[in-house]
Amino acid sequence: MARHGKGPKTNKKKLAPEKERFIQCCADITLELTDSLTSGTTREINLNGLITKYSKKYKLKQQPRLTDIINSIPDQYKKYLLPKLKAKPVRTASGIAVVAVMCKPHRCPHIAYTGNICVYCPGGPDSDFEYSTQSYTGYEPTSMRAIRARYDPYEQARGRVEQLKQLGHSIDKVEYVLMGGTFMSLPKEYREDFIVKLHNALSGFNGNDIDEAILYSQQSLTKCVGITIETRPDYCTQTHLDDMLKYGCTRLEIGVQSLYEDVARDTNRGHTVRSVCETFAVSKDAGYKVVSHMMPDLPNVGMERDIEQFKEYFENPDFRTDGLKIYPTLVIRGTGLYELWKTGRYKSYSANALVDLVARILALVPPWTRIYRVQRDIPMPLVTSGVDNGNLRELALARMKDLGTTCRDVRTREVGIQEVHHKVQPDQVELIRRDYYANGGWETFLSYEDPKKDILIGLLRLRKASKKYTYRKEFTSQRTSIVRELHVYGSVVPLHSRDPRKFQHQGFGTLLMEEAERIAKEEHGSEKISVISGVGVRNYYGKLGYELDGPYMSKRI
């Protein structure tokens, strides 16, 4: 009897469950990766290509993420494959994993005496952007992580360290950057609790005492090699500097924004440019590395005045900081500047003019200064007027190439960055010395470089402090020279291990310290040399004969 209503038989193979196919896909990708190691091929691994190929093969609804691939790699291969796979290798190309954290939202301290916040400043408790900190919108990656963690420092730090670890980065050395308004204007109890939790997040200690937390952090496997605190000149007095030294802070980021007194007054900064110069000098004489924030394209400035102020910044010894963040002015809703823009009293530079300006600024940068950032992390849809492109530094460097100029700042020349972007390795490395006068003191910038390829491997900043601004008893009791920074670049190499292809832990740091000691003794006439050291690096200096001296590591010479 014939069957009715039945179609022709199909050979369609029934698919295995999604989870099973997902595991099989990860296994196949891992097999290809391990095969590339054992076969000895030197070709680059195209991980995205492999993920697309096998996701198609197994008809997956969702592709595996990098963390899924890393988790499926056998332990014996991880050591060799992780450096090739890590997401955003620039994150640790400078030799340190930077972890940004935010303090709780609070009002700007200068409202009390100026009556309002700066005209360009978004965010804060009274802004359109609820639950965001001062000068942030709440939509930057760091802000969103902070909001998810309800501004709990422990949760923020732990979460970010784990995230970097999952993405294949070495988190052996961590530097905290403390953002979110003027941290030093918050109550002392809150500040100390915040810092304790940051140290505890690395060491696993759960006490509340700051000195104890720092002792445990010193011995932790994940070392805190430095803390950066954002502040203002009026919250950078000797008392504030002493507190920050106690926290383990090694670098200050000071908001300057403009070198013109009239612009500082009109934008409602709440401090003078003269106070900025004094802050730089006192901070450097206390051993800190100093980075400042500058904003081109502010109201009533114009292109010529902008270029002039950056020339002044790099040439005038009263400024000349170790680092700089260039933040072109952005018009964001809810700010005083937005009202000026809306009524036609403020107009931003065109995109082309801004690229031109940044290119001209970068051409002025001396080789001892590091340009940390060239624009804010604020998402483009929130920007009403200002920067149109998310890759301003890249565009400016391309413009410089067209104009026949080069950027010789520290970041552009770092060996790790050169490796990531240009696959360039140094050949002949030699010690180079540059001396300059800044903020009342004699600065010596020592570095190991390949002068032919213009690649920087390591640097040391040595200072003979000024008599006028030195106030710390560790420095006034006898003639002292200060090492404000020692940094060997190249991708992070875990402490206690060596990788002959990387530049960390190859002895460059020790050689730089030996030369600094010689200069301090023979040229400065110092009896002692002190280092401002991150909590987790104190043991390194201990091996070089240094002893704890207040918050510093010191040695008689």
Swiss-Prot record:
Its EC number is 2.3.1.311. Changing R373A: Abolished tRNA modification. It catalyses: uridine(34) in tRNA + acetyl-CoA + S-adenosyl-L-methionine + H2O = 5-(carboxymethyl)uridine(34) in tRNA + 5'-deoxyadenosine + L-methionine + CoA + 2 H(+). It comes from the Eukaryota. Changing C108S: Eliminates iron contents. Pathway: tRNA modification; 5-methoxycarbonylmethyl-2-thiouridine-tRNA biosynthesis. Disruption phenotype: Sensitive to caffeine and thermal stress. Resistance to zymocin. Keywords: 4Fe-4S, Acyltransferase, Cytoplasm, Iron, Iron-sulfur, Isopeptide bond, Metal-binding, Nucleus, Repeat, RNA-binding, S-adenosyl-L-methionine, Transferase, tRNA processing, tRNA-binding, Ubl conjugation. Pfam families: Acetyltransf_1 (PF00583), ELP3_N (PF23613), Radical_SAM (PF04055), Radical_SAM_C (PF16199). SUPFAM superfamilies: Acyl-CoA N-acyltransferases (Nat), Radical SAM enzymes. Residues 91-381 form the Radical SAM core domain. Changing H110A: Decreased tRNA modification. One of its GO terms (biological process) is tRNA wobble base 5-methoxycarbonylmethyl-2-thiouridinylation. Its main location: cytoplasm. The keyword Nucleus applies. [4Fe-4S] cluster binds at C108, C118, C121. Acetyl-CoA binds at K173, E485, L486, H487, V488, F508, G509, T510, Y541. Its cofactor is [4Fe-4S] cluster. Residues 405-557 form the N-acetyltransferase domain. SMART domains: Elp3. Changing G168R: Impaired tRNA wobble uridine modification. Catalytic tRNA acetyltransferase subunit of the elongator complex which is required for multiple tRNA modifications, including mcm5U (5-methoxycarbonylmethyl uridine), mcm5s2U (5-methoxycarbonylmethyl-2-thiouridine), and ncm5U (5-carbamoylmethyl uridine). In the elongator complex, acts as a tRNA uridine(34) acetyltransferase, which mediates formation of carboxymethyluridine in the wobble base at position 34 in tRNAs. The complex functions as a gamma-toxin target (TOT); disruption of the complex confers resistance to Kluyveromyces lactis toxin zymocin (pGKL1 killer toxin). Component of the elongator complex which consists of ELP1/IKI3, ELP2, ELP3, ELP4, ELP5/IKI1 and ELP6. The elongator complex is composed of two copies of the Elp123 subcomplex (composed of ELP1/IKI3, ELP2 and ELP3) and two copies of the Elp456 subcomplex (composed of ELP4, ELP5/IKI1 and ELP6). The Elp123 subcomplex forms a two-lobed scaffold, which binds the Elp456 subcomplex asymmetrically. In each lobe, ELP2 is tightly sandwiched between ELP1/IKI3 and ELP3. The Elp123 subcomplex binds tRNA through ELP1/IKI3 and ELP3 and can bind 2 tRNAs simultaneously. Belongs to the ELP3 family. This is Elongator complex protein 3. It comes from Saccharomyces cerevisiae (strain ATCC 204508 / S288c) (Baker's yeast).
